[in-house]
Swiss-Prot record:
Name recorded for this polypeptide: GPN-loop GTPase 3
Cross-referenced SUPFAM superfamilies: P-loop containing nucleoside triphosphate hydrolases
Residues bound to GTP: G13, A14, G15, K16, S17, T18, S173, K174, L175, D176
Entry-linked Gene3D superfamilies: P-loop containing nucleotide triphosphate hydrolases (3.40.50.300)
Known partners and oligomeric status: Heterodimers with GPN1 or GPN2. Binds to RNA polymerase II (RNAPII).
Organism listed in the record: Kluyveromyces lactis (strain ATCC 8585 / CBS 2359 / DSM 70799 / NBRC 1267 / NRRL Y-1140 / WM37) (Yeast)
Amino acid sequence: MSRVGVLVLGPAGAGKSTFCNAIISHMQSIGRRAHIVNLDPAAEATKYEFTIDIRDLISLEDVMEEFGLGPNGSLIYCFEYLLNNLDWLDEEIGDYNDEYLIFDCPGQIELYTHIPVLPTIVRHLQNQLNFNLCATYLLEAPFVIDTSKFFSGALSAMSAMILLELPHINILSKLDLVKDSHNKKALKKFLNPDPLLLTDKVNEETNPKFHKLNEAIANLVDDFGMVQFLPLEAKNPESVSTILSYIDDVTQWAEAQEPKEPNDQIEIDDM
């Protein structure tokens, strides 16, 4: 039977850990089991304990102290060490066959753009451990209200989609931070926007020599058709449930479930 896993991606501060906690809490409330796999060697404490934690293998703090490396260099060292010890990950995952594994990933984009760390882990999970995977990419709602920043975030999300080669769901987090009525109205156009129309706004704010570049970026985003975002309100069960339904669909979670045995406690007379 295939296993199901969700990679949670996005820049630092996008609300990845909050999203993981919201998904875990919601799944527990509906009787489904899930576990968080922490792949961030610099992670801080969260509401829910990590079932599997890369820091049990290697931590950013230890690498920085021992080798005198900076944060980014230490992060890359940690993941190269993990790639050389994937048997540890296999052993930790063990027999989690019928439960969701939610992989909370670091925010550094270079782990899949500059060096093939996350793509290698993805291929290993798929080929060696028989995982059905999808990637979720989070961007902060207050961040994308700025049209230029929207294109920046969309390109980052598209990089993850192309390089990881996984079913992909884009999410706008921290909707509660958008309080101004004007910004709330503006935000709606970014949930399913037309990039070509948004270039007019960008062109108004940039030097004319960048207009062709702006239009080229808009065309690129539009051609890949990845500009739709799902809104996330982490404290709203309906919002979390909607996103989980999308994840279930792309990972084919229902198809991976074994048929339930009839309840032999039910007597014929009770039916």
